[in-house]
Amino acid sequence: MNDKEKEICPRLIDFLVVVGKRNRTRGASQSSPDATTDTTVTYPEILRRYPTDDHKDFILPTDVTVFCQPEGCTTTSARLRKNARNDPQFFVFMLTEKDSAKVRYGICLNFYQSFDRRSTPKDEIKKVPDDAHHKKRDSHVSLTSLCFISHHPFVSIFHQVLLLLKRIIDSSNHRAAQRTGLKDVVWAILTGHYNEPIVPEVMKEIKEIETWILMLLSSPVPVPGKTKVQIEVMPMDLSQVFEFALPDHTRFTLIDFPLHIPFEILGIDMALRVLTAAMLEFKIVIQSRNYNAVSMCILSIVALLYPLEYMFPVIPLLPAYMPSAEQLLLAPTPFLIGVPSSFFHHRKIRELPSDVILVDLDTNCLQVPDDLYIPDLPEPDATHLKERLKNAINKMTTMTVDNETSVTDADFGIDIDSVDVACRVAMVQFFNSANVFGNFSEHTRTLRLYPRPVVSLQTDSFLRSRPQCTQLITDLCRTQAVEYFAECCLCPKNETFVRVQAGIESAEQVGDKPKWFSESLMPVHFMVYPNNSTLDSAIRVYNAEIDNDDYEDDSATSTENSNSIDDLVFDENQVTDAGGEVTKPLAEVNYIYKEPMTLELPQSESVVSIDSSLSSGRSSPDSSLSTSAVDSEADFARLADNLALKSNSQGAFSFDHGSDSEYESTPVSQRRKTIHNPGSDASDTPTSRGSIKSGLRMKGLTTLTDSGEKVLGPSLMNAINGYAEKSQSVFSQVINKTAPKAQALKERTMKPLANRIEQSQHIVRSKTQPNPTSQQTANQQSKNQQTVKEFCDQALVGQSVGMFSAPKLKRLMEDESLRELVCSKLNLGLEVKLSEDEYVKEVQLTKGQFKAYVKILKACLEGIEVSFNTPGCCGFASVFHVLEIAHTHYWAMGGGEVITPSSSAPSTMTTPSEHSNDILKESRPKLPASTIDLRTPTKPLGQNVTPTSTNNHEIAQSTRSPALPPPVPPREAPPIPKRNPPPLGAPPKVPEGARAPPPLPPRPKVKTTAVDETPQNLVPNNQPAQPSSPSFLADADEQTKPLLKPAPPTTLPVGKQEPCKVLPTPNEPVRHYIYQELILAVQHQIWQNLQFWENAFVDLVAQEREIVGMDQEPSEMIDRYSALNDSEKKRLELEEDRLLSTLLHNMTAYMIMCGTGQKALQQKVRRLLGKAHIGLVCSKEINKLLDELPSTQGNFIPLKPLGSRLVQKQSFTVCPGQSSDGQMMFMEVCDDAVVLRSITGAATERWWYERLVNITYSPKTKILCLWRRHDDKVHMHKFHTKKCRELYQCMKAAMERAAARGKVNVEGRALGGEFPVHDTETNQGGLLQVRCDGVAVIFAHNQIFIGLSNIKKCNTFGGNVFLLEEFDRKKGEIIQRRYFSQMADQICYAVLCVFSLAAAGHKKEEHSK
């Protein structure tokens, strides 16, 4: 279910339905109550409904009748019901919409009601006739239902309201009978059993009842975490004020009934077995004679599964009288269904299906078919769970005994609610235990966010990481609930799971009942009881007489189910559609009903719209960028300073607050620490962000009081204004805790290598400190990184790893971060900038480099294999980087030797440019593009590197994130070796023991570029083209031209072909790729393990998304996506498709190179293609590639460059604040946003261009001011940077490009506007107009205009005062004007936009001149 389906319905109650037996004056088929049988059962019908019209978003289902009366409408003799209980029966059912899966709750009250309409003279009402007993014997009662249909599960309160409604109708019925002598006349009229003209006295009663009902249906719904609706239904002496409130996302969802019912009825052990069966998605049927017990048990089981969500049909009470109801038990999908005890008898079911588990609440019996097995819960987690549940239940039992003498009912209710919270907390703790879902997010990887999140659970690594891999967790991982849970962890709608995980367990902090949080909510009072109503007097009279009167002896009686269903007579042919017979309210009071259309918020000084769109903050570069052209830079900086620093004490809109700015500029990584502090204030939830108020925040650091849950005084409305932003960013911090992205990999890889390499003889460590501190861990990791760099540097100069160093290298390569470091150092193709349509270029190595590469990469593969087989490994995305090097790096046999830096004569090193003239003179046939050296010529290795550059490089490496090192900056590549071809006729020497390389197909035709036509870029190419398929042939003219750097092929060379054996000519060096020594020489079993490839793929996807920035605050990105237009949504989806398809393309190439079975390869890739929901454009390319796979193992499929290498970002060093004393950060200017990163590379903020309001800078102070709009609030951020002008120009250019592409939407952003103001000096009211040329203030008798060039300063004061300073050029003085307005902030913002537009226009004029 998506967010739209979860939107809050503004109606508290959708419908009130009266269900029972319709009176039919005609029709012989209707069973008569005067028949010989005393009891008959008919199909229930809707007798009356309020309102009579359906809602636009909800049509009342016709089958609601059988849900209200599951065993049919029973009509029986009052004589038989006389000795029965007089308590109406209450229960709950659910209506689920098929298309949208929306759930509505039915809260039903059933009772037997008489419709005897015999008239008695008024003067004989109190006389008892002689045949009274005979008449009572002949009267009949019929089952009648009062039912609320609502989107909201206020079960207990609705129960009380239904009882009150029945009491109101009974009271009016009693008063009408006294006045008219017509018995049960009100009930008869409301249920359609009265066919005579209605007397005025009775009509008055009907009108008051229907008015009360329609007023009740007009009640609004509370806004979660913001408001509470207080409904006054009767005077206080007759009924309490019913308070409705919904918890916010940091608390458990509302369960307004005793949640512990399954444990109380079945016992803890049996209830846990039923919970386990539901958890594993078995088919479960629960039966009982008590409707309420069975429906509550079903709902409780579903609620106790949190944080899992039951993904299949849930029917708390399946009616026995519903046609074909038994077919649901044959459904192929799992289900959780409650039925009355008569269901199987009535539906003539003799035997349950063999895959259905039956639970009988009446006998406490659990029937499990022989073919099914419910595994036991893992230990010791199950024992701990049972102990917590027993403690909670025993506490309730103890309090029950105590309450009999000393505790009030209200206190007892509090304890019951606390018991329910304790049960829910115990279940959450069980799910979070080590053997169940402990460290669950470390094994999830986000594949995509749009159009809906797709998250992959690495089941294999997850199971291997469990201390005890039980059958339960193995089966649980295969359920849809766990798959959905992985997606919910990315952007959870309810964060209680995370809070309990952090140690926040008390009912006051996570409880769902209003008594724990209602004090902080704004009340919305609603009056249902009209002032002129006489219903209260009728109730008082009825209450006084009910004890001494036998009025109810033959009217309302109990609904206890008949134990002998055989005695009932069923009329199953009476299924009719009574929709046309439902009439409007009898008293013509339809006008009373006012359907709530929007959520109700109390009036405040600031206008807030609950459904305000995030797109309201968008602006175009023309209207949001400004320079200092209008005024001096100092004045503009002061303007920005005033706009930012003026606090708002009234709770209305303000540009910024000092405390807010400081708190918002705090990196996410620092704010995230609150999640681990169980002693923090309740308001400082693990996911809270933004400012509540600085005082409250300071208290929350030391104490755990209720003050953190409340917002006091005038700051309350400010909290409501900022609530949407808090909720938005609340998710982002949960994401940093639970999101399946590479951040988890970073935290894992920062763990010390000590545990894994302590046995190594090559690392000297102190044995006296078995648990090193974090500082020691960081030092050890730094030493390991330095060691790995030395190995890589040696390999780059051609020195191989020694035999004594090899074990140490193998140990180090078991760490994923060090493998990533190796790949970033050894991959010489990283410095080649490629476009999206190019392919990764091949790189030539020297013989020494080749041998060193092979040895180091072998150690990497061995470490990857260890990681794959180690429970709880930190990922192995590096396998793709290793295979990329093996795929593209080669050594040309016979190509000569390059003098390494260790040579004694580095100054005499020969470069390829020395022989360029000789190469040009040769007229030999040229080799196709596959033999061209693709590296750009650089400075030879023999040249010395200055110490400064070396140190800088090492510093950059040390500050890089260990798990995800970004691509290294351009560095000097090894020289192109001098190639001395062997004598004519002499075949190239092949080392002994080396396997002959497979024949290479010719590369596609290449295009020439004028850039690379310099002689030093040319290399000898002497082999003629080999015969192959036409798509691989090069033109003859191309072969005779001087060889140039090739361009990528336009089509994929994946045609089915058997490569011809290429016989090397005497003049052509044979290429020997690394994969031939690394893969072909030793066959690793992991290449045939498809789960290994899938895990590596999702690891690399997570890594790529992290580098590109696709996973930074996913909730914000999803909300932004929903606010974009269709074309922008498609663009974002296509970006994710390209990233995924590129990785799938490369994985296919690697699997072919590693010899994975072709059929298995195709199945796995196609499965991932569907799992990732890749669009048609990109999936078509992958399918074409899979259809034309080469049949020979090798590197025939060219590689595509990763998306992270294509993204070209401009980064600037900034310091938050007005000086350089703050913490250094990096600001990246991207295509559609500005990303702020910490020095560790972690993204802390992302600001989309469409939400930027204004950008200014001051070259004098080196300060860049940036305003952004979020939920109708504007926040300003200041950054000190030496390159403020360059940063401003870069951001401006990026925003202009985004606007040209349509990314920044400017629709609906009208410049200027009119605002009502009140002059504080003259005490006049008027209109303030913000225009392009200035500000005009219009009063009743005069008008003031202030030109734009004369405005010196404008800001807000106190939140509701707009202050404007005008420079009077004639007098040479400044005039200050103050205007009171509730829209002061918007006036200031409008003036700021006009300044920005004027500044941009002025700059354009200067450029045109």
From Swiss-Prot:
Compositional bias ranges of the Basic and acidic residues kind: 915-925
Annotated tissue distribution = Expressed in nearly all neurons.
UniProt feature, compositional bias: Pro residues: 963-1003
What are the start and end residues of every segment in region (Disordered)?
Answer: 654-701, 761-784, 902-1008, 1015-1034
Give an example GO molecular function. guanyl-nucleotide exchange factor activity
Return the Low complexity bias intervals: 773-784, 902-913, 1020-1031
Start and end residues of each Death domain: 1109-1184
Q: Which GO terms describe its biological process?
A: apoptotic process; chemical synaptic transmission; defecation; egg-laying behavior; lipid transport involved in lipid storage; mating; positive regulation of acetylcholine secretion, neurotransmission; positive regulation of anterior/posterior axon guidance
Q: What happens when the gene is disrupted?
A: Worms exhibit pleiotropic behavioral defects that are suggestive of reduced synaptic transmission. RNAi-mediated knockdown in the intestine causes a mild defect in the expulsion step of the defecation cycle.
- Please describe the quaternary structure of this protein: Interacts with cab-1.
Q: Which PANTHER family match?
A: MAP KINASE-ACTIVATING DEATH DOMAIN PROTEIN, MAP-KINASE ACTIVATING DEATH DOMAIN PROTEIN MADD /DENN/AEX-3 C.ELEGANS
Protein name in the entry: MAP kinase-activating death domain protein
Q: Which organism is it from?
A: Caenorhabditis elegans
